[in-house]
Amino acid sequence: MQGVIAFLFVFSIIVIIHEFGHYYFAKKAGILVREFAIGMGPKIFQVRKGETVYTLRLLPIGGYVRMAGHDEDEQEIKPGMMITIVLDSENVVQKLNFDDKIIIENSVPFQIEDADLHKDMTLTGYFINSEEKVTLSVSKTATIIESDGTEVVVAPVERQFNSATLWNRIKTNAAGPMNNFILSILVFIIVGFMQGGVPTNDAIIGQVTNDSEAFVAGLKEGDKVLSIDG
């Protein structure tokens, strides 16, 4: 059991350091990082700082970074879906809630007909008890509460991975393996220091204590034994 726990711990550390490389360079490039997750599976804790939500998930197996437009699983939006939205004083959408277990103060029910949350930043549909179709503007800093309760920021096209320069995309993709390479070098150096030097088969005197027979005989640390009883 201890071996399994040790494996999961080490594997998670490796994956987290790998993903941090992607996270750091994506942030530097202006790519929207929606989520930095530790673990996999169902979410058990989340905290949002700025435009990134940091989550702790149930299964202690690695982690991942969700970059906008880079192989991420977005919230599915279908015509006819009933959600709740939060509007500001100018009727601009500031929050879209797809989790029916979460109740938000000052939110209003809305039935979706169409949504473009990348280019036009619009939401089309009907308010409850109304047959008038309306098209609302969506703020570029609006948030989406996904069906599992994770709250992420919308991803305008200019903040997506493919909108970054080629060089920034290369750096972001390569940063994960680069971090693992640096980690392996650091671990190698640390292990080397912990071993206390390079193993050798030479008969060389190590530490000599003051009350030992070797000390009385005049042996010193570093002396090389040439023969015994010779």
Question: Which ranges hold each PLM region?
Answer:
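Protein maturation boundaries and topogenic segments
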Residues: 1-7, 171-173, 177-197, 201, ...
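C-terminal recognition in membrane/secretory proteostasis and scaffolding
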Residues: 2-3, 159, 230
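Small-residue-rich helix-interface/hinge motifs
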Residues: 3-89, 102-152
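Alpha-helical transmembrane signal-anchor/signal-peptide segments
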Residues: 27-34, 196-213
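Envelope-exposed proteins and targeting segments
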Residues: 52, 157, 201-204, 221
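An N-terminal, globular interaction/scaffold subdomain
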Residues: 94-95
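Interdomain regulatory linker/hinge segments that flank or connect interaction modules
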Residues: 142-185, 189
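Conserved PDZ fold ligand-binding element
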Residues: 206, 214-230
